A protein has these predicted regions:
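Conserved active-site and cofactor/substrate-binding residues in soluble primary-metabolism enzymes
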Residues: 19-26, 53, 76, 103, ...
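Class I S-adenosyl-L-methionine
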Residues: 1-67, 157, 161, 169-170, ...
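General beta-strand structural signal in soluble alpha/beta enzymes
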Residues: 8, 43-45, 71-74, 91, ...
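Short, basic, helix/turn surface patches
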Residues: 35, 93-107, 151-153, 168-176
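Short gly/pro/ser/thr-enriched loop/turn and capping motifs at secondary-structure boundaries
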Residues: 14, 76-79, 127, 151-153
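Flexible, glycine/proline-enriched loop segments at strand-loop-helix junctions
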Residues: 17, 45-46, 68, 95-96, ...
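A contiguous loop/helix-start segment that scaffolds small-molecule binding in enzyme catalytic cores
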Residues: 41, 112-176
């Protein structure tokens, strides 16, 4: 795609819901300008468009405004990361769950009681707390960290509780 045709749309990751919604609305309006001009628009995302993607909010807004839009699946970051770590996410009759860490340790503990294997997305700022919980359960060695997969600063390896992790950090906790 020629550079003059590429438009970057940045989203805020603010904890302020009003700011996030305003940013998403502005993104939808920007896209609508091009669609109204008869142009085709593609919006690549990091990971898969259907798994915790900010685009899904823009997608809903475009549909609400009457535009015909389509989501095309990508490779979820936890699948790409598991491949890079050379581990399967599940085997045989195992089950797995995917949750955000944003709701706290209680949700993580409940999910661990239900699923054989667990994927925790956006865990970067909560790694130490999850590590302490895993250590109390004797499972700290069963966690793999996947951070910035495919981007600068990529890390795929064991959970290191004293390491700094960014927003795009996922943890896979394998069964015993």
């Amino acid at each position: 795609v020629p550079e003059e045709k590429v438009r970057r749309i940045l989203f805020t990751m603010s904890k302020d819901k009003t700011k996030r919604e305003a940013c998403r609305q502005a993104a939808a309006e920007e896209i609508m300008k091009y669609l109204d001009a008869g142009q085709s628009v593609a919006m690549p995302v990091l990971g898969d468009v259907g798994i915790y993607s900010t685009y899904s909010y823009v997608h809903k807004q475009l549909i609400k405004e009457g535009y015909e839009v389509q989501m095309i699946s990508g490779i979820p970051s936890f699948c790409a990361g598991a491949s890079k770590a050379n581990i399967p996410i599940v085997e045989g009759n195992e089950g797995f769950g995917v949750i955000p860490s944003l709701k706290g340790l209680e949700q993580v503990e409940k999910a661990m009681d239900v699923f054989d294997n667990l994927v925790i997305m956006k865990v970067g700022s909560h790694v130490k707390e999850v590590y302490e919980m895993l250590k109390a359960k004797g499972r700290e060695d069963h966690a793999i960290i996947i951070s910035n997969v495919g981007m600068e600063g990529e890390y795929v390896g064991p959970l290191l509780p004293d390491r700094e992790y960014g927003y795009f950090t996922t943890m896979i906790i394998k069964s015993l």
